[in-house]
């Protein structure tokens, strides 16, 4: 039987999971960040990624609804504001739509979800189901992929600005905000997990939750790679560059 880890040992194990399985290791991101994709492939990435962005506040609302401690809810609800925005400030969803606009995608099509890859839809729905059905501790632990986000964001912004003349720093404003939001959120979630994963069984569950979340992110990139890189098998109703870049959803 495994021994109970100290909080710092648990953190080390969680960071090791991210180092091995976070989606910065996926070949599709290497192509994206090194300028190896064409405009249509970047459009496909942004369109499909919007489904994940759209569901982030839904995920956080599901977690929030299960929190009985008002102090905990006050902290967690900031995540929803970050993505939904408020009466005076745009949130992450609006900023992602600003990116898809800048890439030449029709906003109605993006928001409709009609052109998504099935793999994208299934991965995101699996994540929503996970945080709704698993324990609160597991749901919070699944958010710990944000520990690794600042590194990939830096690579993405620098690489896309260097290699793609159709991308501007203004279009990538979403990522600038995440450089401060993600560390704040992950620091809180990590402290919560280290404090509450106080048995061998709970520690195994939080590691499994992070492993699962990494697989959700990886699966989305698998779907993109198969459809838009190689072997190029696109779901018949999914986005097709050139044909659909300005298509308005029926």
Curated annotation (Swiss-Prot):
Pfam family, one: TENA_THI-4
Annotated pathway: Cofactor biosynthesis; pyrroloquinoline quinone biosynthesis
Segments crossing the lipid bilayer: none
Top class in the EC scheme: oxidoreductase
UniProt keyword terms in alphabetical order: Oxidoreductase, PQQ biosynthesis
Annotated EC: 1.3.3.11
Record's catalysed reaction(s): 6-(2-amino-2-carboxyethyl)-7,8-dioxo-1,2,3,4,7,8-hexahydroquinoline-2,4-dicarboxylate + 3 O2 = pyrroloquinoline quinone + 2 H2O2 + 2 H2O + H(+)
A single BP term in Gene Ontology: sulfur compound metabolic process
HAMAP family documented for this protein: PQQ_syn_PqqC
Free-text function comment from the UniProt entry: Ring cyclization and eight-electron oxidation of 3a-(2-amino-2-carboxyethyl)-4,5-dioxo-4,5,6,7,8,9-hexahydroquinoline-7,9-dicarboxylic-acid to PQQ.
Record's protein name: Pyrroloquinoline-quinone synthase
Gene designation per UniProt: pqqC
């Amino acid at each position: 039987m495994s021994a109970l880890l100290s909080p710092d040992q648990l953190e080390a194990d969680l960071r090791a999971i991210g180092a091995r399985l976070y989606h910065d290791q996926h070949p599709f991101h290497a192509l994206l960040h090194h300028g190896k994709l064409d405009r249509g492939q970047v459009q496909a990435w942004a369109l499909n990624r919007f489904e994940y962005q759209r569901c982030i506040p839904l995920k956080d609302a599901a977690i929030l609804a299960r929190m009985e401690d008002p102090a905990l809810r006050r902290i967690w609800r900031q995540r929803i504001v970050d993505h939904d925005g408020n009466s005076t400030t745009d949130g992450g969803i609006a900023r992602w739509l600003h990116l898809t606009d800048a890439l030449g995608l029709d906003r109605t099509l993006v928001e409709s979800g009609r052109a998504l890859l099935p793999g994208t839809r299934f991965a995101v729905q699996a994540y929503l189901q996970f945080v709704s059905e698993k324990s609160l501790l597991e749901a919070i632990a699944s958010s710990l992929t944000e520990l690794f986000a600042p590194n990939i964001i830096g690579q993405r912004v620098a690489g896309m600005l260097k290699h793609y003349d159709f991308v501007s720093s203004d279009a990538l404003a979403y990522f600038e905000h995440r450089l401060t939001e993600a560390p704040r959120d992950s620091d809180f979630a990590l402290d919560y997990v280290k404090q509450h994963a106080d048995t061998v069984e709970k520690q195994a569950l939080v590691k499994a939750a992070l492993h699962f979340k990494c697989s959700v992110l990886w699966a989305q990139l698998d779907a993109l790679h198969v459809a838009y890189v190689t072997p190029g098998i696109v779901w018949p109703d999914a986005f097709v560059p050139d044909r659909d870049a300005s298509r308005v959803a029926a």
